[in-house]
Amino acid sequence: MGRIGIGLTLVVALAAGCTPVVPRPAVTFAVLAGSYYSAQGDVAVEAAVVEDSERLLERAVADVNARRNVNFVLVAGDLLARAEPLSLDRARAMLDELRVPYYVVLGEHDGLAPPPRMGTGSEEAERAGGPARLPGGAGVSRSTVLWTFQGHGISGPQGYWVRKVPPGIVVVGLDTVNPGRHGGHVDARQLAWLDETLSQHQWQMVVIVAHHGLVPLHPLDEGAAWEHLLVDNAGEVREVLERHPNVVMVVTAHHHFAGGRIAGRIVYLASPSISVWPMAYHLVRINQQEAEAVWVPLAPPALARRGQERLLGSEQYRGVFPEGEDGDTACVRLFGGNKMTVYRLPTIRP
């Protein structure tokens, strides 16, 4: 099957405003997500080229390091294909090669966390899309992954955190993983913490990173096919965010494609996957007037073709589109689109 090419530039405008009351310093950051790294390369993940995950993650780190203007990196979940010690150690070592600070939130693949009323790694949990115990009992827990990345946003046993980062902004990491489920959830305790945290930083620009989406980005998000890509109580989370006008952007990564929209004066940006076609990472720039997101491809041509073929063979992603060439084109247009998106930003008035 030949590779289908697509590229779009989208400009989205918000209500016009004058100089922001809250300082909005110019900042550039990268978003690395969905690397599905496996040290052995032998884990099956829907549509992902796991066998080349090490090469792709290394290329992402090298590309970020080659850029002089990147302030920090957000690792937006599903770093691992499967939670196992060697993969975790190697992934951490590769991220430690970054020359700028990096901050981590977890995805549902990043550690074993069986839900209540289900045995660890039960068939029921596995069917629900959650992580399962590895053969022979091998594997690492979410708490182990959290402790591995202490100091990279994470501080203590919780998966949510807040950090002041140069050049003078605040980054908030949310833990949207709902153990044993593919979809996300933010519980009442974390919501209360989020509200209080945003109030404490009301005079600073805030960027939020989470794994699961908080707004629908495609009609399929509102049906059974893709509803698991979102936080199941996303409305409650947005209600908290919209009380705090200093929140400029929410970055997520569970959709695996580059996309975004504006809701309640906040830019909701979805970043592509490193190991699912188009095998890319996001480079995001924010200044006083606008936010720009560009995805940066990582795969050489032969690997990119293989990745696209795997995407088009995926029941979860390609299977929801009509059969035939029109369906192929629609799938590729979605996953390979939004090469660059620009959002006009409003005045921030706490």
Task: Give the positions of each predicted feature.
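N-terminal active-site segment of His-dependent metallophosphoesterases
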Residues: 18-88
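Active-site-proximal beta-strand elements of phosphoester/diester hydrolases
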Residues: 26-42, 168-178, 209, 267-272, ...
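Active-site glycine-centered loops adjacent to acidic/histidine catalytic or metal-binding residues
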Residues: 34, 77-78, 107-108, 174, ...
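Short, flexible/disordered intra-domain loops and linkers
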Residues: 42-51, 115-129, 133, 219-229
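His/acidic metal-ligating clusters that form di-metal
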Residues: 60-72, 164, 170-172, 181-267, ...
